[in-house]
Amino acid sequence: MNQTLLSDFGTPVERVERALEALRNGRGVMVLDDENRENEGDMIFAAETMTVEQMALTIRHGSGIVCLCLTEERRQQLELPMMVTNNSSQFQTAFTVTIEAAQGVTTGVSASDRLTTIRAAVADNAKPSDLNRPGHVFPLRAQPGGVLSRRGHTEATIDLVSMAGFKPAGVLCELTNDDGSMAHAPEVILFAKQHDMTVLTIEDLVAYRQAHEQKAS
């Protein structure tokens, strides 16, 4: 990643720490993955704090595929089968079946309805019957070990919200341009500045975790 593009958001360490602070303050962050991977920017929010306004922003400026990142433990708690048994996607993106809140929604498509579904799925006492299948929210199962085991947006989301002090559940959606094409670093940075969001890379997060875990060992 061209570090000059990201210089307005601080050093790699500062970018991670600013992202954690933003999440703690109920704001979203933008996460860029590696240029030789998807080379895309995702909007990321803590599931516990996401607002209807933030969901509306996500739907308006994103791909429309609003994903709920979960751990394997939560997937099992909710009894969510994986979408396919043989995952042949390029980056092994681990979708489960889609979900909808069993109560409190209409068609399930609106920002309010999608947020109701997310809140139902991440509630401490959530049970399988709280969710209908299929629906308009796309759960993603994160790999154990986070970005140190897979350098994906799913794992970055779980790492960031956990490090910020929230339960390991976060919402992501890929940022798109007005013409429907995928947003890359220059467009992601412009969007972040327009919406007072900080930007970091998965590479930043990998280095941050490695440094802190080496200190702890």
From Swiss-Prot:
InterPro entries: DHBP_synth_RibB-like_a/b_dom (IPR017945), DHBP_synthase_RibB (IPR000422). Mg(2+) 2 binds at residues 38, 153. GO terms for molecular function: 3,4-dihydroxy-2-butanone-4-phosphate synthase activity; magnesium ion binding; manganese ion binding. It holds the Pfam family DHBP_synthase. It comes from Serratia proteamaculans (strain 568). Pathway: Cofactor biosynthesis; riboflavin biosynthesis; 2-hydroxy-3-oxobutyl phosphate from D-ribulose 5-phosphate: step 1/1. Binds 2 divalent metal cations per subunit. Magnesium or manganese. The gene is ribB. GO terms for cellular component: cytosol. This is 3,4-dihydroxy-2-butanone 4-phosphate synthase. It catalyses: D-ribulose 5-phosphate = (2S)-2-hydroxy-3-oxobutyl phosphate + formate + H(+).
